[in-house]
Amino acid sequence: GVSSYGTISELPENQYLLQIVFDTDPQKAPKLIELAKSGLQSLADNGPSEDFLSKAKENFLKNIPENHISNNYWNGKLGQFYKYGKDFDTDYEKVVKELTPEKIQKFIKGILGQNNFIEFVMVPKE
């Protein structure tokens, strides 16, 4: 399977991290890496489709009630407030609803425009 993970941090300076991780046969890794890169480039060139973004937003929003009863969620939000002095919960729903394909496209363009790409391929010991 494939998974992706992204973070945005302000400390010690503004930075973004986007990871795409997958398990595969080492011989297939170059092809999958190129597919991941071309997928990101497509987002930078075209943005996500309205349908894709709508489904993603729906998924983010449906998790809000469950998150609000989780101690782990609130522990994370308190940590963010302590570290950054910002409330990342109150306007979360509004921010998600205001996401547009154009905003996502601009964000991805900004990340890819940095040309800061590191590729790791781990292979089993022979």
What are these regions (language model features)?
Residues 1-45, 50-98, 116-125:
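M16 family metallopeptidases and their MPP-like homologs
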Residues 101-110:
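Low-complexity, intrinsically disordered Gly/Pro/Thr-rich segments
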